[in-house]
Amino acid sequence: MTAETLIASLQLSMPELILAVGAMALLMIGVFSGERATPTVTGLAVAVLIIAGLWLVLKTGEGEAYGGAFLSDPFAKFMKVLALIGSITVMVMTVGHARSAQIDRFEFPVLLVLATLGMLLMISANDLISLYLSLELQSLALYVVAAINRDSVRSTEAGLKYFVLGALSSGMMLYGMSLVYGFTGHTGFDEIAAALTAEGRSLGLVFGLVFILAGLAFKISAVPFHMWTPDVYEGAPTPVTAFFAAGPKVAAISILVRIVINAFEPVVADWQQIIVFISIASMLLGSFAAIGQRNIKRLMAYSSIGHMGYALVGLAAGSMAGVRGVILYMLIYMVMTLGTFACILAMRRREGEHVEGIDDLAGLSQTNPFMATVLTILMFSLAGIPPLAGFFAKYFVFVAAIEAQLYGLAIIGVLASVVGAYYYLRVIKVMWFEEPRGEFARTAGELRLVFGLSGLFVLGYVLIGGPLGTAAEAAARTFF
């Protein structure tokens, strides 16, 4: 690698370098900041993420870096912006709640920055080795974050479960990568696609593909690799759960799209069957398993499993319309989920106790009409009721599936959506038609800002959907 190519590579990966250097600097600042360490480091972490985002949007060009292992293209840029917005939002949500959520440690924002760095590298990965390294960087930070509340048995259990199952999924994925490398002789996505076109598929290669897809399905908590999700969502502190539900899902879906559309495009018939099965299983389990839930964080866990199933409908189509649908679905899903978790974080009694039961929302329309109204809008949107953003998200992926002649998949998706609407409507019924059980403490300004903006986005998507759709189409065109 010459000096010129190295400089060009560094310029393309500047947002990632900003996060890497920023994380190391924040660690040093945290050590020497004394009692004010957590708010100081959290504020600076938000600033680092914003600087990286601005550099990404305004300065970063397009092209390959580090010998083709890193790729900067419109798709990567769009998904990186989503991941950064998710991370910044979670940081803002935790500013006033670190102590009450018992995550009052300066390492927390540093670990979130490192996890975000892993996400950005993952989205730009164009090689199996760079994919694995970035995935592990993200995962190792998240294992610690899940168990960061050492005084809570639930949090420690969540971290341990996530670590054991995450290590297993990483091992499966690595084994799949070794099979793909063994049968093609390459680790780069473009070279793998070229080898598959020239030589055709073999049984060993299909096994490798299955193991890689299984590892990534774990990261997006798709069935049958979803077992960790309800326990980790319930056990981890609420800001951590909000983080899990946003950025990492965006990054994992992004690399899943890049692998199947780019590297394994010549064997579309093989991976399409796998994606269709995972999608149907996730939609059905997400819809039916959530019906009996009494804890709102567990409900959101099953909701996220179902939503990943809907997102995979677009990927199964394998077309430009399908990829565009996936991109828009992840954008809308992230906004709805972060808004909902801001409301969950605001579920705090006057005595300071955080509550998570759906029944604790009883009579919220009388005690906090603004929060009840926003949460109602978000629940309707998650259920896919028109004309809210959630309806358009599902519409785009179902239309792509119909255009790809996957009629059965689209029909099952619509039916699962109808079943799923029940448990969202149950939350609305509890808020508006039951007597209050007590008032929540005054909602913090940053939480009101987050769920207010997300409610506004969901309501106003019908007006701003055009430019977002154009941007998503430009990102999807990267592959076609």
From Swiss-Prot:
Q: What InterPro entries does the database record attribute to this sequence?
A: NADH-Q_OxRdtase_suN/2, ND/Mrp_TM
Regarding protein family, the annotation reads:
Belongs to the complex I subunit 2 family.
Location of the protein in the cell: Cell inner membrane
Enzyme class of the recorded protein, top EC level? translocase
List the Gene Ontology MF annotations in alphabetical order: NADH dehydrogenase (ubiquinone) activity; NADH:ubiquinone reductase (non-electrogenic) activity; quinone binding
The portions of this protein that span the membrane are: 12-32, 38-58, 78-98, 106-126, 128-148, 163-183, 203-223, 241-261, 271-291, 303-323, 326-346, 372-392, 396-416, 449-469
One CC-aspect GO term: plasma membrane
* One annotated GO biological process: ATP synthesis coupled electron transport
Q: Which HAMAP family does the record cross-reference, listed alphabetically?
A: NDH1_NuoN_1
What coarse category fits the chief subcellular location reported for this protein?
Answer: membrane
Q: Give EC number(s), comma-separated.
A: 7.1.1.-
Q: Membrane: is it a keyword of this entry?
A: yes
Q: Which reaction does it catalyse?
A: a quinone + NADH + 5 H(+)(in) = a quinol + NAD(+) + 4 H(+)(out)
Q: How is the subunit organization of this protein annotated in UniProt?
A: NDH-1 is composed of 14 different subunits. Subunits NuoA, H, J, K, L, M, N constitute the membrane sector of the complex.
For membrane topology, the record states: Multi-pass membrane protein
Gene name as annotated: nuoN1
User: Which keywords appear in this protein's UniProt record, sorted alphabetically?
Assistant: Cell inner membrane, Cell membrane, Membrane, NAD, Quinone, Translocase, Transmembrane, Transmembrane helix, Transport, Ubiquinone
What biological function has been recorded for the protein in this entry? Answer: NDH-1 shuttles electrons from NADH, via FMN and iron-sulfur (Fe-S) centers, to quinones in the respiratory chain. The immediate electron acceptor for the enzyme in this species is believed to be ubiquinone. Couples the redox reaction to proton translocation (for every two electrons transferred, four hydrogen ions are translocated across the cytoplasmic membrane), and thus conserves the redox energy in a proton gradient.
Q: Its domain of life?
A: Bacteria
Q: What is this protein called?
A: NADH-quinone oxidoreductase subunit N 1
